[in-house]
Amino acid sequence: MRAPGFWHEPAGVASTLLAPLGALYAAGTARRLRTGPRVRVDVPVICIGNINAGGTGKTPTAIALAQRLLAKGVKVHAVTRGYGGEVEGPLCVEERTHTAKQVGDEALLLSAFLPTWVSTDRQAGARAAVADGAECLILDDGFQNPALAYDLSIVVVDAWRGFGNGRVIPAGPLREPVEIGLKRADIVLSIGPDAAQQRFATTWGRHIAVPHLTGTLQPLPTGLPLDGLPVLAFAGIGHPEKFFQTLRSLGADLHATHALADHQPLTDTLMIRLLRDASMRGAQVVTTEKDAVRLSPEFRAQVMTVPVRLEVDDWGPLDSAVDKVLGR
């Protein structure tokens, strides 16, 4: 499902008419958070979440944070519900044996970097990770889930889109009002280029009373140069156009783009159609790292993947906060 366009436009007729439903949604979120058990486990828990529905860069943030913790010698595990997967868990994901259909694409991608537990019951997932030797947990997308207590919360936001029209689902893109959500945040990380960061700071900066980090998603080099390469690109992520723009910035000659729904299954029928279309155009099929893990092996070899990694302008405030919860 694609987000309605009016979510990211100044409040108009549609968002105003839907505002009462948004108020009910916000009340439900507040009640769930207020009455949740907030169980504490025996190791520090770092929550990476957002206030917006949809993609904001949580997975690249989790990967980058995990790499920093692992470099410090911390045995860090990820706990996620495995959105889009079939497994209830708790299950430690094996990158080479599990599929995105079983555990979800985000969990499968995370498992390439750190031990990752899928569990619809986050408490059970956390306990399983601790029993397996985890010294610290990264809780993926748990900001509005009251099952676990966490020691540090990082709210990730797309700098271009910000908090949209500032209204709650279905009137806008938010899971809860900005001023309420940010009161629970310890750090805000906005991701995007300089122009987007300036726009975000101008529009939303006054709402942020905690350390505000900025960063960008930078593509990693691939074996095949993209400059001048004829490309048919597809992406089933929160904001596909960001990926297409990344390809353009690398010099790719985009002959066609296909914006799929977030987490959309990549069926044989769909992939055969895309590959046939690319062949007729003399183009290379290119996709994101998160989409690539949903491909079956027979198609994965025919599709070029462009991975991205988070680069933060100043890790200092986050490093200090992490060291504090780790007792260092």
UniProtKB/Swiss-Prot annotation:
Transmembrane segments: none annotated. Pathway: Glycolipid biosynthesis; lipid IV(A) biosynthesis; lipid IV(A) from (3R)-3-hydroxytetradecanoyl-[acyl-carrier-protein] and UDP-N-acetyl-alpha-D-glucosamine: step 6/6. It is an enzyme of class 2 (transferase). GO terms for molecular function: ATP binding; tetraacyldisaccharide 4'-kinase activity. Keywords: ATP-binding, Kinase, Lipid A biosynthesis, Lipid biosynthesis, Lipid metabolism, Nucleotide-binding, Transferase. ATP binds at N52, A53, G54, G55, T56, G57, K58, T59. Its EC number is 2.7.1.130. Transfers the gamma-phosphate of ATP to the 4'-position of a tetraacyldisaccharide 1-phosphate intermediate (termed DS-1-P) to form tetraacyldisaccharide 1,4'-bis-phosphate (lipid IVA). This is Tetraacyldisaccharide 4'-kinase. It comes from Jannaschia sp. (strain CCS1). The lineage of its organism: Bacteria, Pseudomonadati, Pseudomonadota, Alphaproteobacteria, Rhodobacterales. The gene is lpxK.
